[in-house]
Amino acid sequence: GVGNDELATVGGKLAQVVKIMGENVTLQIFAGTEGLSTDSEVVFHGEPPKLRVSDNLAGRFFNAYGEPLEGGEIIEGEAREIGGPTVNPFRRIQPSELIATGIAGIDLNNTIVTGQKIPFFADPDQPYNAVMANVALRAKADKIILGGMGLTNDDFLYFKSVFENAGALDRIVSFVNTTENPPVERLLVPDMALTAAEYFAVDKGEKVLVLLTDMTLYADALAIVSNRMDQIPSKDSMPGSLYSDLAKIYEKAVQLPNGGSITIIAVTTLSGGDITHAIPDNTGYITEGQLFLRNDSDTGKVIVDPFAVASETARHRQEDPRGPSAGDERLRAPLRRRGQRQDQAGERLRPLGLRRAHPEVRLRLLGETAGH
């Protein structure tokens, strides 16, 4: 019989089973139904999307189906079903190892540990993809897995040229959906990226950093499918399953006993800076901490703002019609002063992330902190 998530070909176009009701099967055609006749032939493939995994994935760029973009050789290896279950909690261990990104606003103020899942909130006009490329080049990880959704052609070429020029392709695997590709294909990209990550982390015991951009476009693709299936939309026209769909991705982050790990940093663009929109709102409940990208009014540069959460809370409190109390002001003033003095960022170092840092680095940083 036909199974859920099984691939099919409808009139020469690739599709996937999204619902089975008795003898009726609903298919999502990735490239859309334009040009298809009502009597188009349907051929079921008998299996869901799969990715062939091997060490030869490194240095390659793939599309949403796991096919090489540069026209190189097809990867030979075990074909693994994408979108599988997360690691059994019994097999997980407490994350405690620092994963350095090379960006001070992250490493000093929002230290990331292996196995963590953290969103990167940014406005659509900010250079978040450049930041992701920077993290990919500087991060102290064995493998970097990039999942690009809705990338412009310029962004795709930018990632490719940066990785090639830096000579870092041997540790980077990229899965890319561009604006020229069908939007629904974006739904496959995170699962492809995470299947590759699981191979290197679980099978090879490597430290893997997964970079996903842009999760807002991923959620928009979910909404497209939901609308086509006549499902009742939830908040902000998003599907009611948004939380579960996002959690399925983020919960792949894990620290394993064999030393392997999957750490996820995912860009979520904000519409008009609205942090209360359904996408960032649900993301905040699933993930551990947040990173914010903003324009610094003093320097004119784009920075990673470690104090955006505190300042956002303060702003909402000030807008409260009851007005801020004296106690609130006493609590808020030190935060405001701290946010204005980026050179004191070391005070917010996370001891958890420093446990396995180089001894000299740890002593120097903790010594600076103690000196304030």
Please tell me what each predicted stretch does:
Residues 1-101:
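Acidic-enriched and Gly/Ser
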Residues 102-107:
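Short, charged beta->alpha transition segments
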Residues 108-371:
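P-loop NTPase catalytic core
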